[in-house]
Amino acid sequence: MKKLTYLTLSLFSIFTFAQEISKERVKTVLSTLASDEMKGREIGTQENENAANYIAALFKENNLEYCTGKSYLVPFDYNGKTVYNVCGIKKGKSDQYLGFSGHFDHIGTSDKSGDNIYNGADDDASGITTLVGIADYFKNKRPEFSMVFMAFNGEEKGMLGSRAISTDKNLDHIYNKMTALFNFEMVATESQWGKNALYMTGDGFSDLDELFNQNAVNGLKINADPYAKQQLFYRSDNVSFVKKKIIAHSFSTVDMTKASHYHHENDDVNIVDFDNMTQIINNLGKTLDKLSPKNFAPKYNDQVKF
């Protein structure tokens, strides 16, 4: 009886704590995407396709289902060349979806001598690492919401990938049931509010942040957009879904009054706060685990422009 009890407790511990994401995992995913070998992941390059395949492999590790067809890779055309977004599904108890996204492309390399690779660790390998971390968290759990994970291509060329996938009729079965989209854009550094905090672009357009914060665990907080005048809400991939009248916001930690790495060669792993990222990812997972269609149904107000 004691052995059985010990075994039961051991199994309980495994399944209770297995979803906790390690800093080593966060480092591995982000460092791979932001490595020199990826050469800045510019859309249309072999390295960009390598990044897409790497993300697809991570989705497979997490046993995600395909969004459409027989692959995580969702093709679209870029200057006569086939390029890819990456998309995977986690079925939950409800058929209502929460979406998690970021963009994996960056701006490639320059012609100058020395360090000429724009690694894009913060922009936006950090966002992809965050959504992969959420998928990791729920690998052995069944969330209340179903979940869709989307890694967009071509953001740096004008949000091409998010525009393509948001208008893909093969995914309407997801979009018609989507409660909200969390788009992660530059979350590698500590925010102006300190650790364990993000801000939401366009916070004045919906009550998503309020509803999320009501359920947030361990001090995690989504703050108001400190750069509202720059209208970042309309300048990132979330806007492709805003146009579909889906609740969609971007979430960031970057302090734009201090950051010197945006679209520069020094946006590499050396500027990443892996402890903070790991804390945020785990607390996002724990908070999302509390959300259901009963306590999380955000709505736009009449201030948003579609």
Regions of interest found by a model, annotated:
Residues 152-250, 299:
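Metal-dependent peptidase/peptidase-like ectodomains
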Residues 1-21:
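Bacterial Sec-dependent N-terminal signal peptides
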Residues 21-50, 62, 186, 258-264:
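N-terminal capping segment at the start of a domain
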Residues 41-91:
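A non-catalytic alpha/beta surface segment that caps or lines the substrate-entry region
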Residues 258-306:
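His/Asp/Glu-rich mid-to-C-terminal helical/loop segments that flank catalytic regions of hydrolases
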Residues 88, 100, 106, 111-158, ...:
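Alpha-helical metal-binding/catalytic segments enriched in His/Glu/Asp
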Residues 230-277:
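Zn-dependent metallopeptidase/amidohydrolase metal-coordination segment
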Residues 36-46, 74-77, 113-124, 137, ...:
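Second-shell loop/turn segments in exported
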